[in-house]
Amino acid sequence: ITAVKKYFIEQMKELVEEEEALAANKGQLPADNALISAKKNGFSDKYLSQIIGVSEDSIRERRIELGVEEAWEGVHVSGTEDSAYYYSTYNAEDKNPVSENKKIMILGGGPNRIGQGIEFDYCCVHAAKALKALGFETIIVNCNPETVSTDYDTSDKLYFEPLTLEDVLSIYKKEKPLGVI
């Protein structure tokens, strides 16, 4: 009826069934194998917290104890050989080298909202330029592909990630910046 391929319908059905199984045990952390599967299938710590009814901190702590942490893959940008442009996954080895340089992490504005101009993005771009001029490695975290801050050459490194606690803490833990703007 919808012309959506059966494969995609089946994948969605499997995710719904996985969510229902997780929600059946409200108030307690899922079994280790269920938590690992949920992370590999794209369930965020925050969403798991909401459907299971336990704190996001509890889920994050258990996930880290199990060694289930984000890895980063490079985005291949047309015309560049080694762009420092990354997205996270729980399904691969980490391919993101980390330097020992002095770094500052800049959090972008995320998705545009009604009434929001580009002023904040302009500030992020100029912060990156000023910090580079001062000798810092600059790291931008943002998820809006229509901003200048997500251009591959604006910062030394770009994480194309949602601005969630899970993602920002994971990047912070990996990069160990001196500060966050």
Language model features with spans:
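ATP-dependent carboxylate/acyl-activation modules
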Residues: 1-181
